[in-house]
């Protein structure tokens, strides 16, 4: 039984290998095609592109939106939202321990760019997006293709 299994695996591997062959493989002999251009950017964190997101929170009784590009997965049920502690939206997040993370599609880019360019301390951004209140009480953008309603567990400064 063990030999049949090994033979079947070998045959399957050969079939897959032959199915994945490409006629372009012979063209790769040309060394110019094998060279990729690289640029030395120095010692930087370069895990890009990151998804563009708009974070929503209630601040002083009004919805506020903040553009955030540093969002990542830190566990099977946890994400990390990284932003400067100087942002106006932080006070609402710290008070309520709630926020929404709204992915941005191409149609949303102009408004996302705008909310990322002005401070909620000086500008009312609550009407920039049509939204509804999520199950956890955070503002959720209606047009966003994917939304995460988040309850804050920890804040690191």
What positions do the PLM features span?
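C-terminal motif of bacterial Sec signal peptides marking the signal peptidase cleavage site
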Residues: 16-19
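Sec-dependent signal peptide recognition
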Residues: 4-11
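Active-site-proximal mixed secondary-structure blocks
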Residues: 24-67, 72-157
